[in-house]
Amino acid sequence: MLTPAFDLSQDPDFLTIAIRVPYARVSEFDVYFEGSDFKFYAKPYFLRLTLPGRIVENGSEQGSYDADKGIFTIRLPKETPGQHFEGLNMLTALLAPRKSRTAKPLVEEIGASEIPEEVVDDEEFDWEIEQTPCEEVSESALNPQCHYGFGNLRSGVLQRLQDELSDVIDIKDPDFTPAAERRQKRLAAELAKFDPDHYLADFFEDEAIEQILKYNPWWTDKYSKMMAFLEKSQEQENHATLVSFSEEEKYQLRKFVNKSYLLDKRACRQVCYSLIDILLAYCYETRVTEGEKNVESAWNIRKLSPTLCWFETWTNVHDIMVSFGRRVLCYPLYRHFKLVMKAYRDTIKILQLGKSAVLKCLLDIHKIFQENDPAYILNDLYISDYCVWIQKVKSKKLAALAEALKEVSLTKAQLGLELEELEAAALLVQEEETALKAAHSVSGQQTLCSSSEASDSEDSDSSVSSGNEDSGSDSEQDELKDSPSETVSSLQGPFLEESSAFLIVDGGVRRNTAIQESDASQGKPLASSWPLGVSGPLIEELGEQLKTTVQVSEPKGTTAVNRSNIQERDGCQTPNN
């Protein structure tokens, strides 16, 4: 038989059950309901429900079938009109539990149906058994195997799975490691894993952290609606309607096996504490991935939850918060104390929304682990049982759990990682670096100013020196201008008077044309011109005298040049006509 997909809804007077049977023979179907029992059969589908309230057959019941969708819709009247049926979306809890048919259970549930007498063990007790003196034995000897799993109900399961579990849990040999030893090893591993550089990097460069903190997961909107509803009405029974399940989630619920859990007071408290621990890890994962699951999601959840990673047992809520805070700052990519507190507030919101919101989170965790190999083992140990158990928990218990979590306060000093000292030292170093950079910038500006002043002084010095050089060059030019006249005047001494018919120009000799013109104007005959290359006796005599005069009057270093010039001019120059 197949269990069909179904959905329940209600109004003040009727309970509506919608059953999807696309491949059923609609010509043959049976419906039975009485009190809290409901049964439906249409080959090959069979559905049996245990309702949270009583229904009655009074002639007002209705039924219809949608052939296009393949859905039977049945409306059944409530025995007490106006009664609210709680937990109609807890599909697994509505499915009738399976009953044992063969052997008597080792632990019986109070109120369960009696076991037939024929299955009772009638074997007689052996009175001749060998007797030994009574000796007090330690608890560890009485329980050689350590317990873990949902409510610490499992033991001896993981002995043959050590190789497969090495990537899932951090504890080695969980079947032989007591709870106290697990905690000691966990604390030591966390302390060794803590990286101050990684923490400080996220502490100072927190742009990505601030973006993550702004993300609003699905429960934020639901929580806001719930608070707005509470302001208008004090009724709390309709909170479950705020959270709905998808078809995929409903399919998950139908696949779970409905069963009862016999938990004593201590085990029940342990289950509630571990639920907080798992929800904290889930809230962190949902926030940092912004609801988009990835290949690291399963690792994040199980790594941040000591319940899943170390099979940790808890005695109070504060220890859960301390452990979660330490692991957030040691293992994941984003390590910031603000993320710890944000996950803490998100968990409170989920618990206050009720078991529908908690169940939705557990179903998501179950799906993540189921798609990850070998993390699916954690579903068998914890999550599947949580998904069934939470559907039967009273809402008041979750509300009390939320209040207990709200009363917890967590500080950085309580994490035992010396975060405040580390931050203070880092801030001090940062201030010193800032002051050092400021000093360097001031000194650099001073150096720049001094260099500019030096360049200005150099420019002024160069201008002064250039002025001096210009004046020196002008004086030298004046001297050079005066020196030719002195040379000429010295040459004109006794040999060439001012009225001489010959002049010495640029080291050469030419005829004084001015005198010739004056002589011509006075009626004096002009001197005849000699042909080029012919030297008269006067020219030769003057040439000899000029050589002697130049050698005596010109300074050293210029004698050879002037002599060569005079020789050249003496040999080639002729008087002008």
Swiss-Prot record:
Q: What are the start and end residues of every segment in region (Disordered)?
A: 447-492, 549-577
- On whether Nucleus is a keyword of this UniProt record, the answer is yes
Pfam families reported in the protein's UniProt record: SHQ1, SHQ1-like_CS
Q: Where in the cell is it found?
A: Cytoplasm, Cytosol; Nucleus, Nucleoplasm
Write the record's keywords in alphabetical order, separated by commas: Cytoplasm, Disease variant, Dystonia, Intellectual disability, Nucleus
The illness linked here is: Dystonia 35, childhood-onset: A form of dystonia, a disorder defined by the presence of sustained involuntary muscle contraction, often leading to abnormal postures. DYT35 is an autosomal recessive form characterized by the onset of a dystonic movement disorder in the first year of life.
Q: What is this protein called?
A: Protein SHQ1 homolog
**Native organism:** Homo sapiens (Human)
